Design a protein with these regions (language model features):
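N-terminal alpha/beta PP-like core and its mobile active-site loop of ThDP/TPP-dependent enzymes
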Residues: 1-139
């Protein structure tokens, strides 16, 4: 059976007991936004800022003693969530953070595989969020 990766992610969250997601929609996470919003096992709360999503997930875990997920878009969406992610990490509060990503073949990193041009940007509003969060996350 074929399934979209975004639907697999939503089903994975539900199968691991996640019932609540805090999100800000964005183009780089549009398939995730769609899958999370249509999954009957998930309640998605949309916020106005990514930092609010991370802080809401932290508060949710503190109050309900259960993990919540956060879904943000690429680039600035991921970096906007960092303050809340660090806060949760410092206090050992569990959160499941998902950051969208545009198609690899549309990024500058893909183009750089064919040239030696020293660009620091990965593409239009793209940023290597994995390197930034590696010191404040478990996985």
């Amino acid at each position: 059976m074929r399934i979209r990766l975004a639907d697999y992610v939503a089903d994975f969250l539900v199968s691991h007991g996640v019932t609540d997601v805090f999100s800000v929609v964005g183009g780089g996470a549009m398939h995730l936004n769609d899958a999370l919003g249509h999954n009957e096992g998930l309640k998605v709360t949309y916020n106005h800022h990514e930092q609010a999503c991370a802080m809401a997930a932290e508060s949710y875990a503190r109050i309900d003693n259960r993990i919540a997920a956060v879904c943000v878009t690429t680039g600035p969406g991921g970096t906007n969530a960092l303050t809340g992610v660090v806060g949760g990490w410092l206090d050992s509060i569990p959160m499941f953070i998902i950051s969208g990503q545009v198609r690899y073949d549309t990024t500058a990193r893909y183009a750089l595989s064919y040239t030696e041009t020293p660009l620091r940007a990965m593409g239009d509003q793209e940023y290597d969020i994995v390197k930034s969060v590696s010191n404040m996350t478990k996985y």
